[in-house]
Amino acid sequence: MARYLGPKLKLSRREGTDLFLKSGVRAIESKCKIDTAPGQHGARKPRLSDYGSQLREKQKVRRIYGILERQFRNYYKEANRLKGNTGENLLVLLEGRLDNVVYRMGFAATRAEARQLVSHKAIVVNGRVVNIPSFQVSVNDVVAVREKSKKQARIKASLELAEQREKPTWLEVDAAKMEGVFKRVPERSDLSADINEHLIVELYSK
């Protein structure tokens, strides 16, 4: 399955919430009818079955993190294998992706941009270049912008935008040095309350 390359806001309208695929910190309501699905009959909201609700939630989370179906299923299998709550384990694994950490630290305005920075070798982990977006960042890892990439205007602009976002408490960022530390594994209370991971577990448990 290929990565979706169409209009980003259409996906947010499909899910009925801002997926932060393109909007950064700006209110998405000012740009599109977020409560209306795309298409001629978007204003009509069909009543979803239990399966439909579970599928929509899975699609929403998958799109937030920019992950393909096969990757997402593998994350679920890993989360299920680990001790503890499967749904919470899933979110922790997704939050630990390098592209997500780069976004959370403010080096990129969106996760898609963060993925591009990683792929283009603009990011180092513990002093070594890592160009794999799915790389799992561990506690105490130091994630930084590569020295020769620090002059990129988009990174500087992203750091300015990040000042308007809520700062993750599990990360420690030095914006001046363009580096940060993954201090601890995030707890469920640290993450979005707009995600119902239990629906995803129910979907894959069938």
From Swiss-Prot:
GO terms for molecular function: rRNA binding; structural constituent of ribosome. Residues 96-156 form the S4 RNA-binding domain. It comes from the Bacteria. InterPro entries: Ribosomal_uS4 (IPR022801), Ribosomal_uS4_bac-type (IPR005709), Ribosomal_uS4_CS (IPR018079), Ribosomal_uS4_N (IPR001912), S4_RNA-bd (IPR002942), S4_RNA-bd_sf (IPR036986). Keywords: Ribonucleoprotein, Ribosomal protein, RNA-binding, rRNA-binding. GO terms for biological process: ribosomal small subunit biogenesis; translation. SUPFAM superfamilies: Alpha-L RNA-binding motif. GO terms for cellular component: small ribosomal subunit. HAMAP family: Ribosomal_uS4_B (MF_01306_B). Belongs to the universal ribosomal protein uS4 family. PANTHER family: 30S 40S RIBOSOMAL PROTEIN, SMALL RIBOSOMAL SUBUNIT PROTEIN US4M. Part of the 30S ribosomal subunit. Contacts protein S5. The interaction surface between S4 and S5 is involved in control of translational fidelity. NCBIfam families: PRK05327.1 (NF003717), rpsD_bact (TIGR01017). One of the primary rRNA binding proteins, it binds directly to 16S rRNA where it nucleates assembly of the body of the 30S subunit. With S5 and S12 plays an important role in translational accuracy. This is Small ribosomal subunit protein uS4. The gene is rpsD.
